[in-house]
């Protein structure tokens, strides 16, 4: 008999603790071993129960969730899924939690808490399941390294400056899910200001993508923004799919443009990585590079194969550096990947490949 995933739920709301327990205990492969109203109680329960996964509210009394997470990841690293409110402040705190080492997050519904949380049961269970298999990392000073890279002081970024690449024809197309917010940061921060345009589909709910883009914009040398429907796609810019819509690449004459769609979810996701990759295969062909990063499930695998068949060169993040090696594994298994790279070397390999394309970049 397979051992169940032990989950400790930390939330100052008794209702949320009860609902989380109900949802998790309804799954055949997991159970709540204990609940705690605040981090101080949780600290003792961690010692007592040795849970496999912690769900943690971001805002609690006695000790802030971020303070607790920072101490936890330094002293006793373990998989953590954050439980966040759908507010601007909540999104900023959640993104900071992901920087500190949380594996993923699930949002609290704004209204009808009980019905809303029960509707989230499948998503919550999936995230707990993925977290139990995730590689937990210690991340002592992410801001310092990223800020240095953004201002040209990081040693790893220097070689990229020597290869300025300005071309409206070249594009970098990126897809990610669980663990992707930090992976995307690591890919984008070394890019030079004149890098080709980057289009990104990251599985993230509405209300979080704008804060995510703003945070990256403050760390990167390229401009990062949430994509808007119909805007021209320009070099030196990264465009992140809004949490409520699919992002597609389209063309208007000789120009690339961003197209947003409210079509139904694909692979249970909107935005979907497959949708973005397929549009890049159709409209960019050999002019694009495809990059699939850490994530749960198979979204993006089929689309990356379509990009490769259309002439694009494709990358996948390697297993050792992934938080969850799901999407890259599926893409590799389908034969859609040309190069498997560690996250720490992904930007350099992308820029080296772009430099080698030269005159072979073609208008499609």
From Swiss-Prot:
Instruction: Describe the location of the CheB-type methylesterase domain by residue ranges.
Output: 165-357
Q: Which residues carry this modification: 4-aspartylphosphate?
A: 57
Q: According to its UniProt record, which residues of this chain constitute the active site?
A: 177, 203, 299
Keywords recorded for this protein, A-Z: Chemotaxis, Cytoplasm, Hydrolase, Phosphoprotein
Which one of the record's GO molecular function terms can you name? protein-glutamate methylesterase activity
Q: How is it modified after translation?
A: Phosphorylated by CheA. Phosphorylation of the N-terminal regulatory domain activates the methylesterase activity.
The enzyme's main class, written as a single word, is: hydrolase
Q: Which domain of life is it from?
A: Bacteria
User: Cellular location of this protein?
Assistant: Cytoplasm
GO cellular component term of the entry, any: cytoplasm
BP-aspect Gene Ontology terms:
chemotaxis
Cite the Response regulatory domain residue spans from the record.
Answer: 6-123
InterPro entries, per database record: CheB-like, CheB_C, CheY-like_superfamily, Sig_transdc_resp-reg_Me-estase, Sig_transdc_resp-reg_receiver
Q: What is known of its domains?
A: Contains a C-terminal catalytic domain, and an N-terminal region which modulates catalytic activity.
Q: What does this protein do?
A: Involved in chemotaxis. Part of a chemotaxis signal transduction system that modulates chemotaxis in response to various stimuli. Catalyzes the demethylation of specific methylglutamate residues introduced into the chemoreceptors (methyl-accepting chemotaxis proteins or MCP) by CheR. Also mediates the irreversible deamidation of specific glutamine residues to glutamic acid.
**Member of which family?**
Belongs to the CheB family.
Q: Report what the protein is called.
A: Protein-glutamate methylesterase/protein-glutamine glutaminase 1
Organism lineage reads as: Bacteria, Pseudomonadati, Pseudomonadota, Betaproteobacteria, Burkholderiales
